[in-house]
Amino acid sequence: MNEIELRLARLRELMKREHLSAFIFPSTDAHQSEYVADHWRGREWISGFNGSAGTAVVTMKSAALWTDSRYFLAAEEQLEGTEYQLMRLKIEGTPTIAEWLGKELQDVQSPEVGLDGMVNSYNYVKDLSYSLRKLGGITLRTNLDPLEQIWENRPSLPANPVEIQPLEYAGETLASKVARIRKSLRKLHADGMLVSALDDIAWTLNLRGTDVHCNPVFVSYLLIESDKVSLFVDDNKLSPEVKQYLQDNQVSLYKYNKVEKCLESYSEYNILLDGDETSYYLWKAVKCQEIVAAGSPIPAMKAVKNKAEIEGYRSAMLKDGVAMVKFLKWLKPAVEAGGQTEISIDEKLTSLRAEQKLFRDISFDTIAGYAQHGAIVHYEATPETDVVLKPEGLILIDSGAQYQDGTTDITRTIALGPVSEEMKHIYTLVLKAHIQLELVKFPDGASGTQLDAVGRECMWREGYNFLHGTGHGVGSYLCVHEGPHQIRMEWMPTPLRAGMTLTDEPGLYLAGKFGVRIENTVLISDYMSTEFGKFLQIEPLTLCPIDTTPIDVDMLLPEEIDWLNAYHHSVYEKLSPFLDEEEKIWLENATKPIK
């Protein structure tokens, strides 16, 4: 038996004792986070799949894992040798979890499926319960966390220190943010709200932490009432300075595990709960007169950056651009000298970023995919998969950093030497898609779905496509993936507004061959106002040359060439003052106009 088989056997012994026919393991934590602390990585522990998105479902005789297109290839590799069947989300023929369970449990009498109500959202449990009852009378049990019994040496809850995010970077006081939130609550006829999302809590309080790898958040809950603000957090996270700061801002402190008791005795008439962010367990704990089921107003506020945050982004992008130029100048000669691998170049890039002022951490684990690994959208090199780089072909490097004044996210695909005509063609198609999105002008309030087609059209014309989103929101020294705004094919109703930060990251992936992705972090800014309304534009924030050696110039339109040359001129003008002479010469060559 391998390790995963042993874990499944222990789970099934527990399921048998508890009279459960199946158990569901999500990728989330008690706060519905995308990236979670080690304590909540139960889906990874039970399946061996370490992607940030996915759901494992185990019955007494079978097991399956659902994940999205970013992880199809990685999941195939990681699930190999286990009994898990890979379920590819949004691919025709893939059953839903409820459909699969309905079929797997059709011969089981009075089947009961378990899940932990503390790490599954209220809306998810409600919808799944309805689907299971409709399909075959399957009931849900929500009061069991099997990991507490079967996961030996399970990591404890994180207890890392919390720090104050200075006003010079936050741009708005805690008191001002709370006042805006209360104003929104009054419009929704709510007396208070529970905030579960960790980045929403950090943003509201102008605090940051290190409880989650690469994400400057801290495990906590926040209860905002009409006349009181309560933070539920373990006391040992807070220094005397942070405690005084919270006291000065009239924030009351309670232990993290007291949130349920507080909700049970909540004295206001009603409370707003976001069904996508609030766990099923806490939703059911509320005993007030009325629950206002509505989306939290905080993400929309957080999405529109203020002047200080935008200036922070510009400063962070300068620092990150300097680190990237130093790295790219080093990369090809180092590969030609021999001995460099996907892991070693990742370490080099992180070390160069760490030299920059206000560097705190990377913003996600670097994706450095050489050759066929570049086709694995969210590839992460391990000692088992790491390969030596050769002075030929393409390497895709998706990386980012957390600086105290801003978060960065950038992808560059680099030709390490000679490339094939197919590589040039695919690379140029991706570049065209990237540029077309940066060129677009659009009405204030347009959706990300409308913009998504602009970038993809040149690919669609040739029968190519990619299944991940074209762009996601980016936090301000917060999570690198931030909502509610996105640019993607699926309908996204959130209107795009000036001040929002996003990524522009189209890609194409040829399984077993190579992958190409080009990504800038961008800012939505004002373009013009006419009798037809206000119009917006996309402004690149990322400052880093785009490799021109794999470009088939004949494929580019004049406006695309003009954009690339203007972008490279800006990159050189802004970064060169911070470089030494050799680095300036390298950057000047890397940003030469193409014709």
Question: What do these predicted regions represent?
Answer:
Residues 1-595:
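Active-site neighborhoods and metal-handling regions in enzymes and metal-associated proteins
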